[in-house]
Amino acid sequence: MNKKIKIPKDSKAINYKTTDLIREFISDRGKIIPQRITKSTRKKHKLIEKAIKQARLIGLMPFKQKNW
């Protein structure tokens, strides 16, 4: 699971509406990929986590994957 994910430099690009971007930070089982694997900074990873959680609550993204 050593895939390099391109993280945008603009922090405004990371929000709950950009589901195609934040889906890359979710594993096959539906869990958020840790910071040490994605090689993102602490600040960016917190923004990503917040965006994923907001998208899940609104209903844009599932909490669990269907095949798991």
From Swiss-Prot:
Pfam families: Ribosomal_S18. GO terms for molecular function: small ribosomal subunit rRNA binding; structural constituent of ribosome. Keywords: Chloroplast, Plastid, Ribonucleoprotein, Ribosomal protein, RNA-binding, rRNA-binding. The keyword Ribonucleoprotein applies. It is found in: Plastid, Chloroplast. Coiled coil: none annotated. Transmembrane segments: none annotated. GO terms for cellular component: chloroplast; ribonucleoprotein complex; ribosome. GO terms for biological process: translation. Belongs to the bacterial ribosomal protein bS18 family. Part of the 30S ribosomal subunit. This is Small ribosomal subunit protein bS18c. The lineage of its organism: Eukaryota, Rhodophyta, Bangiophyceae, Cyanidiales, Cyanidiaceae. The gene is rps18.
